[in-house]
A protein has these predicted regions:
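FIC/Doc superfamily catalytic core
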Residues: 1-140
Length: 140
């Protein structure tokens, strides 16, 4: 898993959507519905180091949930961040035999409540627990 791979996933997900720049980090401040919190610009972040730290986690399921959460919160791209995070995390989930992360449609509102809390606090403890209890599908 690399930042370049994540960029390729973004390109594929958004290539027919009119989003620019495709497969490249956004360079403008973005707003997020439901919160006044604003992510740092990618130029202010070290995504390589952040990803490396996540990938060092020896607990496979926790690593995948961290990847999912981080990918959504980092707001690397103008659009498609949660979709990219979901696909990237699920690639690792499947590779490691951990099932997939799938937010049940009837729990989307609850998910967004936890997500906004995570965005605003940068503490993923609550959302990770909630994802583990509600969104992991296919564990043997």
């Amino acid at each position: 898993m690399t930042i370049e791979y994540i960029k390729k996933i973004h390109f594929e997900i958004c290539k027919n959507s009119g989003i620019t720049p495709l497969g490249e980090f956004q360079d403008k401040e973005v707003g997020i519905t439901g919160t006044s919190w604003r992510p740092k610009l990618p130029s202010e972040c070290d995504y390589e180091a952040e990803l490396e730290k996540i990938l060092k986690n020896e607990h496979e399921l926790e690593k995948c949930i961290d990847l999912f959460c981080w990918g959504g919160r980092s707001q690397m791209f103008m659009d498609g961040n949660k979709r990219v995070a979901n696909l990237v995390a699920n690639k690792e989930m499947i590779r490691l035999g951990q099932g997939i992360i799938a937010v049940p449609v009837e729990k989307i509102g609850e998910y967004f409540t936890y997500l906004i809390d995570y965005y605003e606090t940068n503490d993923n403890t609550k959302i990770k627990k909630w994802i583990y209890e509600n969104c992991i599908d296919g564990i043997k």
